[in-house]
């Protein structure tokens, strides 16, 4: 089985990270913003795995496990906050967050 070259894996990670960043900057729906953050975290994890496999080290896979645990915590807290925002303001628009200021 032929290995995927390192620059191909890093290019894919960079493209995924850019798509996540564009999703954060363009979309106003908080669920899509949360999904874009998840895409960015997975892109960073992919970069770690690709770099670790290039140097035949397990460090990249260990870092990916840490990234997955951080992503799981981020999703649970983020969805709980989104649920509270939706109950209070009846919208998931990011501009509604500015109404929380006193």
UniProtKB/Swiss-Prot annotation:
| Top-level taxon of origin | Bacteria
Enzyme class at the top of the EC tree: translocase
Compartments where located: Cell inner membrane
Q: Which segments cross the bilayer? A: 6-26, 30-50, 64-84
- Database matches in Gene3D superfamilies: 1.10.287.3510
Q: Which transformation does this protein catalyse, written as a reaction?
A: a quinone + NADH + 5 H(+)(in) = a quinol + NAD(+) + 4 H(+)(out)
Q: Which GO terms describe its biological process?
A: ATP synthesis coupled electron transport
User: Could you tell me the EC number(s) of this protein?
Assistant: 7.1.1.-
Pfam families assigned to the protein according to its UniProt record, in alphabetical order: Oxidored_q2
- Identify the GO cellular component terms for this protein: NADH dehydrogenase complex; plasma membrane
**Alphabetically ordered keywords of this record:** Cell inner membrane, Cell membrane, Membrane, NAD, Quinone, Translocase, Transmembrane, Transmembrane helix, Transport, Ubiquinone
Bilayer disposition of the protein: Multi-pass membrane protein
Q: Which GO terms describe its molecular function?
A: NADH:ubiquinone reductase (non-electrogenic) activity; quinone binding
Main subcellular location = membrane
Q: Which family does it belong to?
A: Belongs to the complex I subunit 4L family.
Query: PANTHER family given for it?
Result: NADH-UBIQUINONE OXIDOREDUCTASE CHAIN 4L, NADH-UBIQUINONE OXIDOREDUCTASE SUBUNIT ND4L
Q: What does this protein do?
A: NDH-1 shuttles electrons from NADH, via FMN and iron-sulfur (Fe-S) centers, to quinones in the respiratory chain. The immediate electron acceptor for the enzyme in this species is believed to be ubiquinone. Couples the redox reaction to proton translocation (for every two electrons transferred, four hydrogen ions are translocated across the cytoplasmic membrane), and thus conserves the redox energy in a proton gradient.
Q: How does it assemble?
A: NDH-1 is composed of 14 different subunits. Subunits NuoA, H, J, K, L, M, N constitute the membrane sector of the complex.
**What name appears for this protein in its UniProt entry?**
NADH-quinone oxidoreductase subunit K
The gene is nuoK
